[in-house]
Amino acid sequence: MAQERSGIAVGLNKGHKTTPLNTPKTRISRSKGKASRRTAFVRDIAREVVGLAPYERRVIELLRNAQDKRARKLAKKRLGTFTRGKRKVEDMQRVIAEARRVGAH
């Protein structure tokens, strides 16, 4: 929180004396797009049951062959925007790492 003003015209703490606002929680409107724990859990279960989409399998194959740029281009083409494609490629890299971890044990 901001420090209370001193009432003096100069210095780091200059300005009229004010009472600081105490806003406890963030607005609900700011939390849009954040997945709840329940939603994340349900999506995780669905991913386990259903598996990967064909384009996701192809992205993984490209990543395994060290063709990151091609994988990003494919994901961008399938998903529409560069940012979504980038996020999907990161997600697929996480899937590969998890598979390696499971395979090692």
Curated annotation (Swiss-Prot):
<keyword id="KW-0689">Ribosomal protein</keyword>
<keyword id="KW-0687">Ribonucleoprotein</keyword>
<dbReference type="InterPro" id="IPR000509">
    <property type="entry name" value="Ribosomal_eL36"/>
</dbReference>
<dbReference type="GO" id="GO:0002181">
    <property type="term" value="P:cytoplasmic translation"/>
</dbReference>
<keyword id="KW-0963">Cytoplasm</keyword>
<comment type="similarity">
    <text>Belongs to the eukaryotic ribosomal protein eL36 family.</text>
</comment>
<comment type="subunit">
    <text>Component of the large ribosomal subunit (LSU).</text>
</comment>
<dbReference type="InterPro" id="IPR038097">
    <property type="entry name" value="Ribosomal_eL36_sf"/>
</dbReference>
<comment type="function">
    <text>Component of the ribosome, a large ribonucleoprotein complex responsible for the synthesis of proteins in the cell. The small ribosomal subunit (SSU) binds messenger RNAs (mRNAs) and translates the encoded message by selecting cognate aminoacyl-transfer RNA (tRNA) molecules. The large subunit (LSU) contains the ribosomal catalytic site termed the peptidyl transferase center (PTC), which catalyzes the formation of peptide bonds, thereby polymerizing the amino acids delivered by tRNAs into a polypeptide chain.</text>
</comment>
<dbReference type="GO" id="GO:0022625">
    <property type="term" value="C:cytosolic large ribosomal subunit"/>
</dbReference>
<dbReference type="Pfam" id="PF01158">
    <property type="entry name" value="Ribosomal_L36e"/>
</dbReference>
<feature type="compositionally biased region" description="Basic residues">
    <location>
        <begin position="27"/>
        <end position="36"/>
    </location>
</feature>
<dbReference type="GO" id="GO:0003735">
    <property type="term" value="F:structural constituent of ribosome"/>
</dbReference>
<protein>
    <recommendedName>
        <fullName>Large ribosomal subunit protein eL36</fullName>
    </recommendedName>
</protein>
<feature type="region of interest" description="Disordered">
    <location>
        <begin position="1"/>
        <end position="36"/>
    </location>
</feature>
